[in-house]
Amino acid sequence: MGLPWYRVHTVVLNDPGRLLSVHIMHTALVAGWAGSMALYELAVFDPSDPVLDPMWRQGMFVIPFMTRLGITNSWGGWGIAGGTVTNPGLWSYEGVAGAHIAFSGLCFLAAIWHWVYWDLEVFYDERTGKPSLDLPKIFGIHLFLSGVACFGFGAFHVTGLYGPGIWVSDPYGLTGKVQPLKPAWGAEGFDPFVPGGIASHHIAAGTLGILAGLFHLSVRPPQRLYKGLRMGNIETVLSSSIAAVFFAAFVVAGTMWYGSATTPIELFGPTRYQWDQGYFQQEIYRRVSAGLAENQSLSETWSKIPEKLAFYDYIGNNPAKGGLFRAGSMDNGDGIAVGWLGHPIFRDKEGRELFVRRMPTFFETFPVLLVDGDGIVRADVPFRRAESKYSVEQVGVTVAFYGGELNDVSYSDPATVKKYARRAQLGEIFELDRATLKSDGVFRSSPRGWFTFGHASFALLFFFGHIWHGARTLFRDVFAGIDPDLDAQVEFGAFQKLGDPTTRRQAV
């Protein structure tokens, strides 16, 4: 046929059997990729430290999505929360991966069957004897079935009526686990961070889909609407399908990047805005202040801060710190976190507590500034010693650690103080193992960043695809040159104003 590569899909334009075949093959490829990727990730995933080396630090992409839907155990005998599991059951990580691969194989065989047996009676219009599809009816069927699936997920899986529930956690990502949810039917259900909204919205959207599907199955579109929207053209289906996909891709890119109940930080890592707003730092200080108010010592209060919470408050876990084209997991960047050294508190020789100004997200280097409680700069690490007024040596800065591995250890040596001041720019200080993975020390993004970038990019691409195919189907007759009014519109002298049919010249 000699088609260029970008026009090869024309071969299924008027061939419903093979159109179905290529879609089944596409499903086979998607399911096969998902299952294979899951097995690869399970082969390289280390579940030994869910606090300091969670799945998102290791660059896992499909494991978080399985976990979000209620899969937490492996046939390897481990669970996502740590410890050993004796009876993981059929629906383990490996079980889900295997089911996807088996489904992929069945779809592969079905695609071959439909490619070979393309000339089925069901695809022919009995009145004309030509191949045709009742597209409005097919739309109704798909809408009804997707509504049933949507309703079933919300009413059974998420609520635990028949299923495990989904991953639910507290606002600081500390106590997450899979649990059933009650639907949130009030205004709170519209809060993107309220998990109950997932159940209620799926139930509501599923109900709407079922009703809309039944409507489209029982009511035929008016003739003018059918012709106006080109409902008989398969490219109309392509255009509107692309619209649905790009809209969904934009939505999930937003919920992933900005955070929501559907993208828990325990599974996908923190968002960049939690670093920008000092979200975890504020919670840590709130807990410390509460402990000090109960007459606990600094050492006692900081020792009670969960290592998991401290780890979130580290810039290396900010998905916006890794460049989009730096391949590899976060562990391949700054290394595998081994332990929290503790919280450093800096003081000058007058006993004032000093706070290190934290590095903003989009800086690679940042001056080391130590400010007091009023925000006044009291010390720094100068670029030029000759002009320094606030150097660590001149101000007499010391550092003491509370909590973590260096609990109650203090340093007054200027070189050591400056080392920890530089590291405090990056949030809480952790010991990082760079040797095991030969980590290069350059920050990487988390799966949250990769997912967002991929979906936003493809959404933009698909947006243009929607415009392209929508224009092709709406103006098909014009592009093909078969519009009955086309000749008259461009004929010189036919209209007083070129192309305006209201100004047609009258024959004398």
From Swiss-Prot:
Subunit record text: PSII is composed of 1 copy each of membrane proteins PsbA, PsbB, PsbC, PsbD, PsbE, PsbF, PsbH, PsbI, PsbJ, PsbK, PsbL, PsbM, PsbT, PsbX, PsbY, PsbZ, Psb30/Ycf12, at least 3 peripheral proteins of the oxygen-evolving complex and a large number of cofactors. It forms dimeric complexes.
A GO term from the CC aspect: plastid membrane
Protein name: Photosystem II CP47 reaction center protein
NCBIfam families, sorted: PS_II_CP47 (TIGR03039)
GO biological process: photosynthetic electron transport in photosystem II
Membrane topology: Multi-pass membrane protein
The keyword Transport is assigned to this record: no
GO molecular function: chlorophyll binding; electron transporter, transferring electrons within the cyclic electron transport pathway of photosynthesis activity
InterPro entries according to UniProt: PS_antenna-like, PS_II_antenna-like_sf, PSII_PsbB
Family: Belongs to the PsbB/PsbC family. PsbB subfamily.
Alphabetical list of Gene3D superfamilies matching this protein: Photosystem II CP47 reaction center protein
A Pfam family it matches: PSII
Source species: Cuscuta exaltata
Coiled coil: none
Sorted UniProt keywords: Chlorophyll, Chromophore, Membrane, Photosynthesis, Photosystem II, Plastid, Transmembrane, Transmembrane helix
Function: One of the components of the core complex of photosystem II (PSII). It binds chlorophyll and helps catalyze the primary light-induced photochemical processes of PSII. PSII is a light-driven water:plastoquinone oxidoreductase, using light energy to abstract electrons from H(2)O, generating O(2) and a proton gradient subsequently used for ATP formation.
Cofactor remark: Binds multiple chlorophylls. PSII binds additional chlorophylls, carotenoids and specific lipids.
Main location (coarse class): plastid
Sequence intervals crossing the membrane: 21-36, 101-115, 140-156, 203-218, 237-252, 457-472
Location of this chain's protein in the cell: Plastid membrane
